[in-house]
């Protein structure tokens, strides 16, 4: 929570984030004192304090939201063939094969081009960020 009379949160573009520009036509302004942001799509999100001096002291946050779309991009390897039936026991004892110490290697992870974000997660970090800022005041 933060004091909405003295503070606000701005969602900004990367340039305004880097320059702590608190005035911009494209800014999304939050000033309810208890900001929660839904992360509904992947990509970069930039948040700064609406108080420029606070932003310049480091009160800003960049979030990278990763997508959970690995099911679509998994590389399907052929299913393993059925194990061959074990031979019938022979009358003479034979040494049993030693167990394999190596396990099958896992399928490779998909090669994601670019950075993505988790969808549907509630963004509470802004609240914590502003709480820290209030402690600094």
From Swiss-Prot:
Query: Where are glycans found on this sequence?
Result: 13, 51, 68
Is Disulfide bond one of the keywords? Answer: yes
Secreted in keyword set: no
Q: Name one GO molecular function term.
A: electron transfer activity
The protein's UniProt keywords, in alphabetical order, are:
Disulfide bond, Glycoprotein, Membrane, Nitrogen fixation, Nodulation, Signal
Ranges where the Phytocyanin domain occurs: 1-67
* Disulfide bond positions: 20-55
Name what induces it: During nodulation in legume roots after Rhizobium infection, and after release of bacteria from the infection thread.
Q: Which GO BP terms apply? A: nodulation
Q: GO CC: one term? A: peribacteroid membrane
Subcellular localization: Symbiosome, Peribacteroid membrane
Q: Please list where the region (Disordered) is annotated.
A: 70-115
Q: What residue spans carry the Pro residues bias annotation?
A: 80-98
Job description of the protein: May act as a carbohydrate transporter.
Q: Which PANTHER family match?
A: BLUE COPPER PROTEIN, EARLY NODULIN-LIKE PROTEIN 10
**Descriptive protein name:** Early nodulin-55-1
Species per Swiss-Prot/TrEMBL record: Glycine max (Soybean)
Gene that produces this protein: ENOD55-1
């Amino acid at each position: 929570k933060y004091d909405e009379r003295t503070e606000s949160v701005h969602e900004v573009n990367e340039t305004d984030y880097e320059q702590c520009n608190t005035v911009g036509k494209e800014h999304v302004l939050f000033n309810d004192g208890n900001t929660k942001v839904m992360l509904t799509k992947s990509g970069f999100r930039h948040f700064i304090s609406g108080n420029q001096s606070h932003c310049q002291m480091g009160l800003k946050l960049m979030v990278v939201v990763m997508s959970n779309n690995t099911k679509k991009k998994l590389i399907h390897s052929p299913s393993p063939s059925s194990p061959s039936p074990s031979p019938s026991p022979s009358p003479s004892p034979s040494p049993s094969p030693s167990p394999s110490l190596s396990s099958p290697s896992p399928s490779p992870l998909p090669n994601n081009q670019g950075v993505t974000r988790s969808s549907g997660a509630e963004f509470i970090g802004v609240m914590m960020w502003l709480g820290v800022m209030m402690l600094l005041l």
